[in-house]
Amino acid sequence: MIHKLLKRPQAIIGLCLIAIVIVIAIAAPVFSPHDPELVNLSQKYAQPDAEYPLGTDQLGRCTLSRLLYGARYSIGISLPVLLILSVIGLIVGTFSACAGEKADHFITILCDVFIAFPSLIIAIAVIGVLGNGLQNIAVSVVIATWAWFVRIVRSYSVQEMGKDYILAARISGCNTGKLVFRHLIPNILPQFLVYVSTGVASSIIMVSSFAFLGLGLPSGTPEWGAMLNDARTALYSHPELLIYPGLCIFVTAAGFNLFGEALRDILMPEEDSL
């Protein structure tokens, strides 16, 4: 599969963008010329120079340093959240497809209830109850979006349940746990990985949306969404303060989406031909 990915330009571009963002997130303290939260009002709205390569914001904070540290929040929250959602989706979704009509009906109705409300509204409500904090942001995103993951896994699982290899496994006396982990999950995993890879972008955008609205993170946190919010007052005089974090969000989301599309074309070629 790696060989096939390397033959696709969109996969290479996507992987390069993802790698750059991850390296920046890990090495932000090394690359940052200043403390991202250091306020220096005497340098307010300073123009780019050797000391401040991208200038400063309304409080004299180094824009480049804040952008570099912003990658830590976007990646550091989104990837663990996607891992948790993937585990929940795989376990609950496959259980729903295998456990019988009553359990399946209950889980389906529960998912429909959550999906009926916009994910952002649910997440905002959860943050309102739990308060600020990185853990609370992660919890709110999980609560707001778990139903989508369960639903998509259940859909894949139901399609597989009628196939011959599943029927053969049942006839041979395979119990539900063995059926799920040995037969069902390995066969739906390629499709699910495609869904997860494109879901990273949505998670990053949701986290940035919280910060833009002033939710979840303390004031002054160097996060891309928060930087967009802070720069609104300087929209016309210093538009670059909005362009920089907006571009970071766009590039990161585009990297994961490009990689997800390439992965889909390889693992699910039947959809690409439609």
For each of these PLM feature ranges, what is it?
Residues 63-98, 252:
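Transmembrane alpha-helix signature in integral membrane proteins
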Residues 53, 57, 87-89, 97-160, ...:
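Generic hydrophobic transmembrane alpha-helix motif, especially the helices
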Residues 72-88, 123, 177-209, 256:
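Transmembrane alpha-helices
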Residues 127-129, 157, 205-248, 274:
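Glycine-rich helix-loop "coupling/hinge" segments at transmembrane-helix boundaries
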Residues 124, 133-138, 142, 148-152, ...:
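Non-cytoplasmic
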Residues 1-34, 188:
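N-terminal signal-anchor/first transmembrane alpha helix
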Residues 144, 190, 194-200, 239-274:
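C-terminal transmembrane helix and the adjacent membrane-cytosol boundary/short C-terminal tail
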